[in-house]
Regions:
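Topology signature of small-to-medium multi-pass alpha-helical membrane proteins
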Residues: 2-174
């Protein structure tokens, strides 16, 4: 089974379950033009986003591994560290879904990814600044996570990506 056939099957299942409607609301059916989706700059942008998400996954997994190793060495790891490490991985999984749907041209997914790439770094850095909440290594992990998210936001707000994903026209009320 090829990677493309797996992607096609996943897309068909996603559409059959009407998850775009659930996640995208009234803009669920709005898809950008095919020529903009296939544009080399769009393809390049999504390749960068995928690599940044892979890096975020590595950072999240590294945080869990460090916590496990420190626990095995006899250190007490605060619950906030375990919670944060788990949440980072779950957030990253949702970002993969948004990136996948945006790469297929769904405006709602592009907007969600863009929104989260703005909000998560701010929240993460504010929480990292709370004295004593996390050990130093976890504060560094949060800073790295934020920098990666800012990178995703930077790619998504480039002139090309904003022109590739124009806002949908307002619908007339019935």
């Amino acid at each position: 089974m090829t990677q493309q056939s797996i992607a096609d099957r996943a897309d068909r299942l996603w559409c059959r379950l009407r998850l775009d409607r659930l996640a995208g609301g009234r803009q669920a059916d709005y898809v950008i033009r095919e020529d903009m989706l296939a544009h080399p700059a769009t393809v390049r942008s999504f390749r960068r986003i995928r690599w940044l998400l892979v890096a975020e996954t590595v950072v999240g997994l590294a945080a869990i591994v460090v916590a496990i190793l420190l626990t095995r060495a006899g250190e007490t790891i605060p619950w906030a560290v375990w919670f944060r490490a788990t949440v980072v991985l779950l957030i990253t999984l949702t970002l993969y879904v948004f990136a996948w749907r945006a790469q297929l041209g769904y405006y709602w997914a592009y907007q969600r990814l863009r929104l989260f790439s703005r909000i998560f770094p701010i929240v993460t850095l504010i929480i990292a600044a709370i004295p004593g909440l996390y050990p130093f290594w976890m504060v560094i992990e949060q800073i790295v996570f934020s920098v990666l998210m800012i990178g995703i936001g930077d790619v998504l707000t480039s002139d090309h990506m904003r022109s590739a994903f124009p806002k949908p026209a307002k619908r007339e009320a019935p």
